Amino acid sequence: KGQVEYRDVTFRYSKNSEAVVEHVSFKAEAGQTIAFIGSTGSGKSTLVNLIPRFYDVSAGEILVDGVNVQDYGLEDLRNKVGYIPQKAVLFSGDVKGNLDFGHSQETPLSEQAMWQALELAQSKNFIEDKEAGLESEVAQGGTNFSGGQRQRLAIARALARKPEILIFDDSFSALDYKTDRVLRQELAEKTKSMTKLIVAQRISTIMDADLILVLDQGKVVGQGTHKELLANNEVYQEIAYSQLSKEELEHGK
């Protein structure tokens, strides 16, 4: 469960506008990590936003577990997907309420599940340090937490629901490199069955992905592992060498 397949997907915001995403095809098997990289405006975020149907494809189709996303009820589809946006959204209330958001009222999350999600998202320490713990207050927009903390709480919220598919829409950019690395190692070990789709700007975030798609102006201009792309894809090489040294780049898959 958690297989995602794009079949010749094209998306434009309106009938006559230019395609933001054009003729994209790939398949993610359950449990795989697929990453998307490319310059700003290359269509990475739009591409993953088509899975939970924030937008609908203009042509082609997207299948989740072999079923077209348009044939699911929206709630059923979104229950399969944990989506973490680039800008974490927190609501006024307490930590508990923020983690439980999106869970059905009949089966609220247990505190144990919340702590597990917080630990996995590298948030346990700063919540434990607060006197009220899970009952700690969250200001509107989460302004009483740092940017990196807000991001980790949004990741914990998505993890707590145990979705089949996790979509990180550039969600690692607010984290420092060390937290980013530790979090990805933990995710790799403890969410093996979840399919992970990662939109990123930093090569270091995606070097271990099973498949990386390089996007340029809405088109896939390369796909493969880090090693393959580093050897034969100019767009990827350009991004990679502008960020990391040759030695650092040799550690990926």
Model-derived segments and spans:
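ABC-type nucleotide-binding domain
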Residues: 1-253
